[in-house]
């Protein structure tokens, strides 16, 4: 086979055997180089604060792990989520353990603390949000079947690592969304679920 590099493309000649026939094919393969941080063109924290956000609020219902809280902040920053509501026992910034996982996203993503999750849900409903519990429940809609209205604002309630979303919160939500799972475990980590 012949190989030459031109304009950051690699030209490769290779033989392929399909159904007993030998075919000679030439393909361009892009040379993949990891980008440097300076090449990513990310927003500054100041520009992020002023940027347009997606109309989504993440509600954390009694999340006990500081690492999970930090991960949710980092994911929310990546997708420009409008805000995070921290409820009940969920820890709030500033916190060194949250910062360790969030890598500063707790300083860019807006957040608000509520003593009770139902109080946060009531506020969201009054402000016109469609509130969705992410939970395994009777009548839940599988994520791959979910139809969203792009003209609406949404809030997703993420439950405690052991008990999930409180039933009194589920009762006050517009819909339950369930992530299909095909293995042996009953649930996913809450920060992974938020990312999905």
Please describe what each predicted stretch is.
Residues 1-5:
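Short, small-residue-biased leader/transition segments that mark boundaries at the very start
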Residues 13, 17-196:
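Post-transcriptional modification and biogenesis factors for structured RNAs
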């Amino acid at each position: 086979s012949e190989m030459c590099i031109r304009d950051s493309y690699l030209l490769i000649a290779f033989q392929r055997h399909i159904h007993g026939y030998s075919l000679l094919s030439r393909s361009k393969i892009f040379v993949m180089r990891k980008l440097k941080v300076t090449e990513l063109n990310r927003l500054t924290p100041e520009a992020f604060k002023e940027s347009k956000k997606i109309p989504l609020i993440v509600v954390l219902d009694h999340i006990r792990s500081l690492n999970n809280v930090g991960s949710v902040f980092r994911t929310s920053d990546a997708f420009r989520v409008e805000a995070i509501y921290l409820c009940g026992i969920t820890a709030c910034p500033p916190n060194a353990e949250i910062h360790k996982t969030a890598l500063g996203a707790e300083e860019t993503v807006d957040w608000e603390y509520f003593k009770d999750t139902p109080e946060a849900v009531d506020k969201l409903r009054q402000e016109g949000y469609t509130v969705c519990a992410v939970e395994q429940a009777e009548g839940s809609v599988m994520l791959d079947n979910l139809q969203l209205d792009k003209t609406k604002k949404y809030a997703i309630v993420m439950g405690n690592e052991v008990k999930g979303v409180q039933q009194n919160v589920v009762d006050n939500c517009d819909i339950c969304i369930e992530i299909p799972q095909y293995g042996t475990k009953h649930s996913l980590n809450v920060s992974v679920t938020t990312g999905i």
